[in-house]
Amino acid sequence: MADNDRTALRRKALRRGLMSEYVAAVFLMLKGYRILALRHRTRLGEIDIIARKGDLAVFVEVKARHGEAAAVDAVSVIAQKRIRAASDLWLARQADQARLSQRYDIVAVMPGRLPRHFPDAF
């Protein structure tokens, strides 16, 4: 495969990921969550969405797949550890950290269907 083809595929995947994260964020807002950050980057990794509902901080991994099971299975143990490490850094910077509970969710974004939210997925 030529470099141009690989670059085009990467760009397409990035666009799909960005759109999926936006769709997931809107979906979560409709469910009453306040979105605090999209694509939050730390030195330990990236968190797709950081949301809050009351005293609950939710760290969300978004996966665009054709099915729910494929989306959930796509979040590897290594990815879970990376997200947890990044969330620890984010939490350490919050003034009300002691009050906050935390949860790790997955939102599956599938073509032609509403997103599916998996609370407390890992």
From Swiss-Prot:
Per its UniProt entry, which superkingdom is the organism in? Bacteria
Pfam family, any one: UPF0102
Q: Which InterPro entries match?
A: Restrct_endonuc-II-like, tRNA_endonuc-like_dom_sf, UPF0102_YraN-like
State the Gene Ontology terms under molecular function. Answer: nucleic acid binding
Q: Please give the family membership noted in the entry.
A: Belongs to the UPF0102 family.
What name is this protein filed under? UPF0102 protein Rleg2_4331
Q: What is the lineage of its organism?
A: Bacteria, Pseudomonadati, Pseudomonadota, Alphaproteobacteria, Hyphomicrobiales
